């Protein structure tokens, strides 16, 4: 805690510094922050505020709360994931989605605690009066509050899935979906929740994107999102046109593959080729992250397989088919074996 305002916010780049000022003015209009009039009574925590560019190209102000976050204990909590959403979806159903604008700013900060969330810009002291981005407990707080909305609408028969400010509602038919969509928008309005009409999909659909996947409830399929595959293919193209890449780049490639392999049939098997090559030729405890490794023909052949998946995507079943056979296998340094029915 400091009696004197410290950590002034500012960029040497004049254009970026102007963007910071514009975002602070915007937060003032949204009543997310407030000016602390001087002289400054009592103590406060002062931090730097910076901008993070969103996928839309717009800017999000984030306060650097690393020091405060070290003192916070965030309880464990359940939040929707791609797995829970996937398991909840039913082929043939419809969905619509709601995206909230400035989600965290819907949660007010207790007046006595706002002094812990201060920053200085051009000699003026500000403090957050709404939940800021950058606080480690923010996802937990926001989810706990919005879970009450979820419980309320479940009583009304609305199947709502929450992933922070991205909401997905599943319904059995189109007409019911239009009614529930209108109900949810009206409810958000009554609760003071701002709906982002540009990013929301309020018309019931059977083909939609949510979190990391492209879902097709009509044909019982799930595909990777186009932008995620494009990012992966850009890295693959670099490897295909190179003779050597660093171990760090190999790990980045494998990480991108791992994020998409659940959406692509046999992807985990094909990922094993570059993964095995890295394990055989590099030791993370001994070798540098920047050591150069070759990109041999068999690795490039495996990468071409991934490239073909983007040209002709097959996806994976939303609901897997019933199994007709069970095969049990085991292996050791001395041998291997398999068992299926009466066959061994």
Where are these regions (language model features)?
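Catalytic palm active-site di-aspartate
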Residues: 64, 99-101, 134, 155-174, ...
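C-terminal reverse transcriptase regions that engage the nucleic-acid substrate
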Residues: 73, 127, 202-318
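Conserved catalytic palm subdomain of right-hand nucleotidyl-transferase polymerases, strongest
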Residues: 56-69, 85-109, 249-252, 327-329
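Reverse-transcriptase-like RNA-dependent polymerase core
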Residues: 1-4, 52-60, 101-126, 142-151, ...
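Reverse-transcribing Pol proteins
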Residues: 1-77, 124, 161-166, 264-300
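Active-site palm subdomain of RNA-directed nucleic acid polymerases
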Residues: 37, 139-188
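Conserved pre-motif C helix in the palm subdomain of viral-like polymerases
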Residues: 27, 58, 93, 104, ...
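RNase H-like nuclease fold core
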Residues: 316-344
């Amino acid at each position: 805690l400091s009696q004197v305002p410290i950590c002034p916010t500012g960029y040497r780049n004049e254009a970026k510094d102007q963007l910071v000022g514009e975002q602070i003015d915007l937060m003032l209009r949204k009543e997310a922050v407030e000016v602390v009039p001087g002289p400054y009574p009592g103590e406060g925590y002062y931090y730097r505020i910076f901008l993070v560019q969103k996928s839309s190209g717009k800017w999000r102000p984030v306060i650097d709360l690393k020091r405060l976050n070290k003192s916070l204990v965030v309880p464990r909590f359940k939040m929707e994931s791609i797995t829970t959403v996937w398991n909840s979806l039913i082929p043939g159903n419809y969905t619509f989605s709601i995206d909230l604008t400035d989600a965290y700013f819907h949660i007010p900060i207790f007046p006595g605690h706002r002094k812990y969330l201060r920053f200085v810009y051009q000699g003026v002291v500000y403090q957050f009066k709404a939940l800021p981005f950058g606080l480690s407990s923010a996802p937990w707080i926001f989810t706990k509050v919005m879970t009450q909305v979820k419980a309320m609408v479940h009583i009304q028969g609305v199947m709502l899935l929450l992933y922070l400010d991205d909401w997905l509602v599943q319904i059995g038919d189109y007409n019911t979906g239009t009614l529930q969509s209108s109900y949810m928008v009206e409810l958000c309005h009554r609760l003071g929740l701002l709906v982002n009409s540009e990013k929301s999909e309020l018309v019931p659909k059977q083909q939609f994107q949510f979190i990391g996947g492209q879902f097709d409830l009509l044909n019982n399929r799930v595909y990777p999102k186009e932008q995620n595959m494009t990012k992966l293919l850009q890295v693959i193209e670099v490897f295909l046109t190179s003779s050597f890449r660093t171990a760090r780049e190999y790990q980045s490639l494998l990480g991108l593959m791992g994020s998409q392999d659940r959406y692509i049939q046999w992807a985990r098997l094909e990922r094993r080729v570059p993964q095995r090559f890295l394990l055989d030729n590099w030791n993370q405890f001994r070798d540098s992250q920047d050591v150069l490794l070759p990109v041999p023909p068999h690795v490039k052949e495996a990468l071409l397989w991934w490239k073909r998946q983007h040209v002709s995507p097959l996806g994976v079943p939303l609901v897997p088919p019933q199994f007709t056979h069970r095969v049990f296998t085991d292996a050791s340094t001395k041998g291997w074996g398999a068992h299926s029915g009466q066959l061994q």
